[in-house]
Amino acid sequence: MLRVRILLIYLCTFVVITSTKTIEYTACNDTIIIPCIIDNPTKYIRWKLDNHDILTYNKTSKTTILSKWHTSARLHSLSDSDVSLIMEYKDILPGTYTCGDNTGIKYTVKLIQRHTNWFNDYQTMLMFIFTGITLFLLFLEIAYTSISVVFSTNLGILQVFGCVIAMIELCGAFLFYPSMFTLRHIIGLLMMTLPSIFLIITKVFSFWLLCKLSCAVHLIIYYQLAGYILTVLGLGLSLKECVDGTLLLSGLGTIMVSEHFGLLFLVCFPSTQRDYY
């Protein structure tokens, strides 16, 4: 009878007590803490991802054994009960993480990766607004040029060129929405922004056809070129998740403002009409 009682006590000591929790993480997290609370852990603490060891901490010798795939892993605290795991984003993999001690007490956390938007909603909305207004102003610029001069080969080239720019940027807008960080959305953003350099060519063509090339026009063109440079720099800094798109927006906004100035100059400053046959 005494042996039976001792055996029951021994089995109860090593009973597996499991608690499960689900948490999410995104690419915006530099480090991730996976919580684990074990009251009075005994000899060692072991963390696993599915069936693979990540970290083993020996309380007696104060030593830690790490997996070569999770070199940034460490215990968040060495207190008696808080044995949460902290790792850098580069070492994190989605899956089931388990912490436990030698008594069989286990705490299970299911880690799920949640994909976030590339840019926040406010910045995404401004990108579409700036691009849309710029294309509308381009259409007005070409339309005004078309009704101001007699049709010619050069005017036909301007019209076709403007249509190609508009088609590329509109296709890019469809690919970019919604602003997730995938290959499709990266291509969409490139198609929305990079063709802006050709707006300078259309502007020069329009002013040349209307005989309005002057110092003021050169200033507008330089201003638009500065906006394009800001756009390219902002685009280069934005080719990763969870970034601030302020510089990119500044470039797109500058291009939009230069289109406003260009259209006003075309309309408000008269010149001698040139006819082409």
Swiss-Prot record:
Membrane association type: Multi-pass membrane protein
An MF annotation (GO) of this entry: thrombospondin receptor activity
A cellular component term, taken from the record's GO annotations: plasma membrane
Signal peptide bounds: none
GO biological process: positive regulation of cell-cell adhesion; positive regulation of inflammatory response; positive regulation of phagocytosis
Entry-listed glycosylation sites: 29, 58
InterPro entries in UniProt: CD47, CD47-like_TM, CD47_Vset, Ig-like_fold
Alphabetical keyword list: Glycoprotein, Host membrane, Membrane, Transmembrane, Transmembrane helix
Keyword Membrane: yes
Function per UniProt: Promotes, when overexpressed, the influx of extracellular Ca(2+), leading to membrane permeability and host cell necrosis.
Entry's family note: Belongs to the orthopoxvirus OPG166 protein family.
Protein name, as recorded: Protein OPG166
Organism: Monkeypox virus
Gene name, Swiss-Prot/TrEMBL: OPG166
